């Protein structure tokens, strides 16, 4: 069955390779979770790009105003799945996504990485009581999300967003750091080039080096296709299974994404914590048609 899925995957990718490989990638799609089986509803799953569509798809709004709290925008979650909490601006257009891991699950993991000390994770209560560590990313300038938002015309022209901002602290405006939109602008930054993986792209890891300590591990990797940011991924130490949106790369597969030489602490932390749980977010229309 796996061989059939891989064969189908290859055929679809080959057919799509004939579609304008020279044009710049656009952000017209919003999907999560990588996988080989294109027939699975879990793989490259589409997420709603508008607040109204989110409601019709079964997502419910979390408590909180658009601004004035730990995060920006109106947040929507489906059921109790904190792995993909979608953020919309005040006009109801997609503005970002959060990736959350319940504190109860984190406390079961044997890891030297501190979720409390990492500025990339913010602890928040949802549904009145459950504490969740959230990584928050925005797809438009954080300053506009609750200050006018995007117009319908802007959304139609720009698609899912105009860039990627990672909230790296308690203030969603002041502490949100923009990731370079083009790969050429990575030069001279702290982003370190890792491996290229077909159907994903070229991975970049912030501050990664051979002798780093995993207490400094940054849980977001930026991924480029044909020189432009087209997707990214969240990655946390621990084997979390509360959501079907998670990916669980083997230790061997994980090394394919990492910089060379591979940070020594990551393999150690992988064994100690029981693995890594990741979730890719894709903006390109046909993410499975990405070649190295």
Language model regions located:
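Classical eukaryotic N-terminal signal peptides for Sec-dependent ER targeting/secretion
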Residues: 1-11
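Primary mode marks residue(s) on the alpha4-beta5-alpha5 output face of response regulator receiver
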Residues: 22-292
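N-terminal signal peptide
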Residues: 11-26
């Amino acid at each position: 069955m796996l061989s059939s899925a891989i064969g189908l995957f290859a055929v679809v990718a080959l057919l799509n390779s004939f579609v304008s490989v020279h044009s710049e990638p656009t952000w017209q799609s919003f999907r999560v979770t990588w996988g080989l089986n294109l027939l699975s509803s879990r793989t490259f799953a589409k997420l709603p790009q508008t607040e109204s569509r989110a409601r019709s798809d079964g997502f419910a709004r979390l408590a909180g105003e658009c601004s004035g709290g730990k995060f920006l925008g109106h947040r929507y979650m489906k059921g109790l799945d904190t792995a993909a909490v979608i953020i919309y601006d005040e006009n109801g257009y997609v503005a970002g996504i959060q990736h959350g891991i319940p504190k109860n699950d984190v406390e079961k993991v044997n890891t030297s990485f501190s979720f409390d000390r990492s500025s990339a994770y913010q602890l928040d209560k949802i549904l009145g009581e459950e504490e969740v560590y959230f990584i928050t990313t925005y797809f438009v300038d954080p300053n506009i999300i609750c200050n006018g938002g995007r117009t319908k015309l802007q959304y139609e022209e720009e698609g899912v967003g105009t860039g990627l901002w990672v909230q790296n602290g308690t203030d969603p405006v002041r502490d949100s750091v923009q990731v370079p939109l083009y790969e050429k602008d990575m030069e001279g930054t702290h982003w370190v080039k890792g491996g290229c993986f077909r159907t994903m792209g070229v991975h970049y890891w912030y501050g990664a080096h051979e002798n780093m300590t995993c207490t400094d591990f940054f849980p977001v990797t930026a991924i480029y296709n044909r020189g432009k940011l087209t997707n990214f991924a969240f990655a946390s130490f621990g084997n979390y299974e509360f959501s079907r949106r998670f990916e669980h790369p083997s230790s061997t597969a994980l090394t394919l994404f990492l910089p060379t030489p591979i940070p020594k602490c990551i393999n150690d932390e992988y064994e100690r914590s029981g693995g890594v749980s990741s979730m890719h977010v894709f903006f390109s229309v046909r993410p499975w048609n990405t070649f190295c």
